[in-house]
Regions:
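Alpha-helical solenoid repeat scaffolds, predominantly canonical TPR units
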Residues: 5-6, 40
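A domain-start/cap signature at the N-terminus of enzymes
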Residues: 46-101, 155
Length: 169
C-alpha cells in the first residue's frame, strides 16, 4: 500500500514535514490502522509542535479516527497554534534591489514555502537573471503556505508587483 511504501522509505527523507505527517496519518487511517494513524498525528502535533488549518481535520480520510479523544486533543492543540500563526502571517518577497538585468518572480506551490520554491527555481539564476521569491500570507500548515484565488492571493501579488521598481529593468 501507499502507507507501507511511505513508512518503509521514511528514513530516506531529510526531515518529516507537516505535509508528510499528514500523508502518514491519513494513509494509516484509510488503511484501517487507527493506532498508527493516531500515533502519527500525536507525533506531529504533540511531540513536534506542528499545526494545520482546521479544514485538514475535516478530511474524510480521517473519519474512522475522528471520534477518538486523542484526535480531538490534537485537533484542538493544532487549532490554537493555527490561530496564533494567523496573527503573525504576512506576504514575504525576497526582492530588495536590482542585481541582474532580468527579473524572475517565483511563487511557491500550495503546501510549500520560499525555501522549497528555491529548490525548483534557483537553476534560472545566472549572469542575466535575478530570481526572487514570493511567499503567501495564507497559511496552510506549519511553515507551509498556499495561494487562494478567492482569498488574498491576488491582492498580495498586486502589492508585491507594485513594490518593485520596474523602471530599473
Amino acid at each position: 500500500t501507499a502507507y507501507d511504501f511511505l513508512v518503509n522509505n521514511i528514513d530516506d527523507l531529510e526531515s518529516i514535514s507537516s505535509q508528510v505527517y499528514n500523508f502518514l496519518y491519513c494513509l494509516a487511517a484509510t488503511s484501517n490502522k487507527k493506532e498508527e494513524a493516531l500515533g502519527w498525528l500525536e507525533e506531529a502535533v504533540i511531540i513536534e509542535g506542528l499545526w494545520y488549518r482546521p479544514e485538514v481535520f475535516e478530511d474524510e480520510d480521517l473519519d474512522n479516527i475522528r471520534e477518538e479523544k486523542r484526535f480531538e486533543i490534537c485537533s484542538k492543540k493544532s487549532e490554537v497554534r493555527y490561530l496564533e500563526a494567523l496573527k503573525n502571517t504576512k506576504t514575504v518577497c525576497t526582492w530588495t534591489e536590482k542585481k541582474k538585468d532580468r527579473l524572475v518572480l517565483a511563487l511557491h506551490g500550495n503546501q510549500q514555502n520560499n525555501d522549497i520554491s528555491k529548490n525548483y527555481w534557483s537553476f534560472l539564476e545566472d549572469d542575466k537573471y535575478q530570481v526572487e521569491y514570493i511567499q503567501s500570507e495564507e497559511i496552510d500548515s506549519y511553515r507551509l503556505f498556499r495561494w487562494e484565488d478567492k482569498g488574498s492571493g491576488p491582492d498580495q501579488l498586486n502589492e508585491v508587483i507594485n513594490s518593485i521598481d520596474w523602471n530599473l529593468y
